């Protein structure tokens, strides 16, 4: 269940609840099954013109060290169906070691060091999006200053994707 409310033209907030059950999924802590039944979270966004400031917090029920939050800012008005639209953004992520992270487009563990410590992580991520043609989007991300929750340095990371809207 996901609900979002626009308070006015500039501010919105929302919440979500997902029943996960006993699905056998790979978690951010390296486990291949989960220790919880539900995931819940809240988000908020404020925008004025091309500026967007946002944040989100998510937690697994009944599991310690299982929250993840992020805050960020974005400048631009990227829309994949609008030719030459663009946006740039900066986000900060803080993920506890047992956070309910299923493989997403975000970096979710410290296994870039080829270890199995899975201590959670904290990192900054710089992103940019551009639509060179209608319904074609190019996105690039660079994560930096990443550390585990215990303060161990994690490699910087980057990725790019090309999206088509049909």
What are the residue ranges of the model-derived segments?
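Mobile, glycine-rich extracellular loop/lid and propeptide segments
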Residues: 1-3
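Outer-membrane beta-barrel pore domains
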Residues: 6-166
